[in-house]
UniProtKB/Swiss-Prot annotation:
Transmembrane segments: none annotated. One of its GO terms (cellular component) is cytoplasm. Coiled coil: none annotated. This is UPF0291 protein Nther_1806. It comes from Natranaerobius thermophilus (strain ATCC BAA-1301 / DSM 18059 / JW/NM-WN-LF).
Length: 60
């Protein structure tokens, strides 16, 4: 699930990146948070399509 805290932190890091740059640790955190966000979006899309996001995808 995508929480507002997750979105807020992603936005904070984005703003800092544009203003003054990020440390290596912040860059790693940013990547991790973005991946978590994308995973949540994919789950939401699959759920709306009627597929179980926890199941393995079908190979067509």
């Amino acid at each position: 699930m995508i929480s507002q805290d997750l979105i807020n932190r992603i936005n904070e890091l984005y703003k800092k990146q544009k203003e003054s740059g990020l440390t290596d640790e912040e860059q790693q955190e940013q990547q991790k948070l973005r991946q978590e966000y994308l995973k949540g979006i994919r789950k939401q899309v699959l759920k709306q399509m009627g597929e179980d996001p926890e199941k393995e995808p079908k190979n067509n």
